[in-house]
């Protein structure tokens, strides 16, 4: 269920900087360079139209949060995530992706404050959706926190996954194991994955838990080889969206497994074999290692 509440007024400098950034992006004609496209799947017209509309929507919601208007409290982090993925896919510099992540975490904190003030335990707000329904958002957000080495961000994301620190709440063991690589996170590595095909993430968990680099690399290759079809099996609506890039209906933002890169980064793996996969974010791990 979506929890609705009043956004607390953001710090003026943070808000004004974001608004200036959005207005600049919208004022200047949106440009697309296929040579920078990290997957090479965007159609130019679709990208320009969808990205401009996303920026316009963000500006409207940011303006609403500046006032005391009531908006869905999880709307901004989700929309910022979609915009960030679009920007990464289109080839935006990593430093801009980092700024966007900072905005996502900022509004996650706002959401948590709203929920703790107005929410009820039986009406938990899921900014990223319950873990038994999780697509790629949760592991991607966790993975990006790790690749940017921002444990403060990760603490906020961890709180947003389980606002009440409820041990009885379902969790995906691979997500918790991923967070535990950097910050103490309670989880049971033998916990079952959700029904409906979510056990395609078992090799990710095995890669994290493996004692040797060779084993970790083997499991990551297995995970990535089944990543796309695994997401299809669980009903991830992003899958195959590149095939229908209609600005009115299409939803392609890119396909990425930042969690895989985070494991390779933290375990200092030779990721040469992982770079064959279109959705392995090699630019991101190269930036982290620089």
Protein language model features and the residues they cover:
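Eukaryote-skewed repeat-based solenoidal scaffolds used as protein-protein interaction platforms
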Residues: 9-243, 252
């Amino acid at each position: 269920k979506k929890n609705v509440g009043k956004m607390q007024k953001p710090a003026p400098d943070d808000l004004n900087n974001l608004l200036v950034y959005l207005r600049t992006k919208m004022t200047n004609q949106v440009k697309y360079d296929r040579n920078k496209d990290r997957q090479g799947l965007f159609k130019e017209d679709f990208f320009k139209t969808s990205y401009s509309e996303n920026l316009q929507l963000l500006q409207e919601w940011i303006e609403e949060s500046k006032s005391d208007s009531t908006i869905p409290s999880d709307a901004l982090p989700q929309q910022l995530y979609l915009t960030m993925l679009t920007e990464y896919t289109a080839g935006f510099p990593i430093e801009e992706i980092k700024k966007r992540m900072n905005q996502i975490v900022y509004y996650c904190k706002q959401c948590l404050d709203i929920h703790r003030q107005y929410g009820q335990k039986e009406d938990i707000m899921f900014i990223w959706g319950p873990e038994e329904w999780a697509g790629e958002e949760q592991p991607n957000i966790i993975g990006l926190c790790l690749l940017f080495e921002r444990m403060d961000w990760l603490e906020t994301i961890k709180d947003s996954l389980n606002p009440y620190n409820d041990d009885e709440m379902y969790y995906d063991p691979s997500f918790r194991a991923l967070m535990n690589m950097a910050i103490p996170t309670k989880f049971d590595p033998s916990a079952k994955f959700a029904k409906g095909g979510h056990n395609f993430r078992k090799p990710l968990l095995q890669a994290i838990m493996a004692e040797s680099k060779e084993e970790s690399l083997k499991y990551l290759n297995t995970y990535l080889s089944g990543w796309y079809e695994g997401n299809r099996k669980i009903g991830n609506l992003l899958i195959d969206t590149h095939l229908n890039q209609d600005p009115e209906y299409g939803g392609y933002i890119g396909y990425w497994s930042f969690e895989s890169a985070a494991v390779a980064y933290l375990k200092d793996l030779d990721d040469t074999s992982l770079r064959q996969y279109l959705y392995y974010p090699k630019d991101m791990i190269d930036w982290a290692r620089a």
